[in-house]
UniProtKB/Swiss-Prot annotation:
The keyword Secreted does not apply. It comes from Helicobacter acinonychis (strain Sheeba). This is ATP-dependent protease ATPase subunit HslU. A double ring-shaped homohexamer of HslV is capped on each side by a ring-shaped HslU homohexamer. The assembly of the HslU/HslV complex is dependent on binding of ATP. It is found in: Cytoplasm. Pfam families: AAA, AAA_2. GO terms for molecular function: ATP binding; ATP hydrolysis activity; peptidase activity; proteasome-activating activity. ATPase subunit of a proteasome-like degradation complex; this subunit has chaperone activity. The binding of ATP and its subsequent hydrolysis by HslU are essential for unfolding of protein substrates subsequently hydrolyzed by HslV. HslU recognizes the N-terminal part of its protein substrates and unfolds these before they are guided to HslV for hydrolysis.
Length: 443
């Protein structure tokens, strides 16, 4: 089944492999994404009338808010960008304006489409690269030679190509012509400045300018791959498709939305620009036209997912108009000791599996006893209770501390099996978790 055509149940089943619990949040995301697919199956006139129901996710850091949205965008190949609301300033102040999040989305969308096109042409690109390098390594065939010599040259070229593909000649150096690196355009500036940037680049930088470079065959493969890709790809078609996809199926995840809420608890320490950022954000979420370097994009069919911990403020502290643009709200549960244990043992790419794979590169086999995993979950949970609650992110810190010496002295353990026991976990973490000051500064 096409990933774009996943049913809500299939979406939740997929998310269950990577994220423990948070059933309600998974359900909301699954329905919202399925509705994108449903809308695209309707006739054009009705499509325009149906706008996405934006979601507000409420929960502490590290409980899975970002991961749920990111995983879904990845599996369904949707244009996705994650931004932090606290990084923006209202128009007229120094800093990033909120429209830049839409430009970032379009950039990601175009890159996504470009990579898909490159994947389709992968074999053709690699063949062209190998042929070009082979011709550089072989002396050119003189004109007017016999058919027999031409056949010999063709056979030599074929053998040379096979050796290049197999990596036998990766260290050999060759001189090739490569196009000058194009100048990057800052897409976060206002449209007027963006156009000035593009015009200046056209004047001072010619795309066709090339320079000679001496590279290894391995480096030449990558340099030529990028160049040949550009000649084979239809850049205009990619830009148009990227714009269209961002417009119809893009997802913008706005984290830390609570940081721009105006809380009565803050009293006189209120930042006057917070409401300004909310008001600047409002037309984008409601639906407006944003200019990007690839063209204009309408934002009314982009799905916005906002998230925040709301420890110092409440969702009702956002301006009413913005609250109304996030009609679906879901609260994510805090992580218990049991959930911590499940995260370590039941997720498809758990932190434990990641560390085991990393150390296996050094020839070290790491095994965790079940009691050790339970102790890790318990101590991580306790550390969250005594210090700032950072959710599942605490597990990275505690496991890193337990495996610190083994990771550093990995070559001494090469070819051995190392078992992580409950006693080892306690010896590494017990005193740290017991001391509240040490928890704050070390864990």
């Amino acid at each position: 089944m096409s990933k774009l055509n996943m049913t809500p149940r299939e979406i939740v089943t997929y998310l269950d492999e990577y994220i423990i619990e948070q059933k309600e949040a998974k359900k909301f995301i699954a329905i919202a994404l399925r509705n994108r697919y449903r809308r695209l199956q309707l006739e054009k006139s009705l499509q325009e009338e149906i706008t996405p129901k934006n979601i507000l996710m409420i929960g502490s850091t590290g409980v899975g808010k970002t991961e749920i949205a990111r995983r879904m965008a990845k599996i369904m190949k949707l244009p996705f960008v994650k931004v932090e609301a606290s990084k923006y300033t209202e128009v007229g102040f120094v800093g990033r304006d909120v429209e830049s999040m839409v430009r970032d989305l379009v950039n990601n969308s175009v890159l996504l489409v470009e990579n898909e096109h490159k994947e389709k042409l992968k074999d053709k690109i690699e063949e062209a690269v190998v042929e070009k390098i082979a011709k550089k390594l072989l002396p050119p065939l003189p004109s007017g030679v016999s058919e027999e010599k031409k056949q010999e040259y063709a056979n030599s070229l074929l053998r040379m190509q096979q050796r290049i593909v197999q990596g036998e000649l990766d260290s050999r150096e060759i001189e090739i012509e490569v196009r000058k690196k194009s100048i990057e355009i800052d897409s976060n500036v206002p449209p007027e400045i963006l156009r000035v940037q593009e015009n200046l680049i056209k004047v001072f930088h010619k795309e066709q300018d090339k320079v000679k470079k001496t590279l290894s065959v391995k480096e030449a493969k990558e340099a030529l791959k990028a160049e040949i890709s550009d000649t084979l790809l239809d850049s205009e078609a990619i830009k148009m498709e990227g714009l269209k996809r961002a417009e119809s199926s893009g997802v913008i995840f706005i984290d830390e939305i609570d940081k721009i809420a105006i809380s009565p608890k803050e009293g006189g320490r209120q930042d006057p620009s917070k409401e300004g950022v909310q008001r600047d954000l409002l037309p984008i979420v409601e639906g407006s036209v944003v200019n990007t370097k690839y063209g204009s994009i309408k934002t009314e069919h982009i799905l916005f997912i906002a998230a925040g911990a709301f420890h110092l403020s409440k969702p009702s502290d956002l301006i009413p108009e913005l609250q109304g643009r996030f009609p679906l709200r879901v609260e994510l549960e805090n992580l218990t000791e049991e959930i911590m244990y499940m995260i370590l043992t039941q997720t498809k790419t758990s932190i434990i599996k990641q560390y085991q794979a990393l150390l296996k590169v050094e020839g070290v086999e790491v095994a965790f006893e079940d009691d050790a995993i339970k102790e890790l979950a318990k101590l991580s949970y306790n550390a969250n209770q005594k210090s700032e609650d950072i959710g599942a992110r605490r597990l990275h810190t505690t496991i890193e501390k337990v495996l610190e010496d083994i990771s550093f002295e990995a070559e001494d353990y090469s070819g051995q099996k190392v078992t992580i026991t409950k006693e080892l976990v306690q010896s590494k973490l017990g005193d740290l978790v017991a001391d509240e000051n040490l928890v704050k500064y070390i864990l």
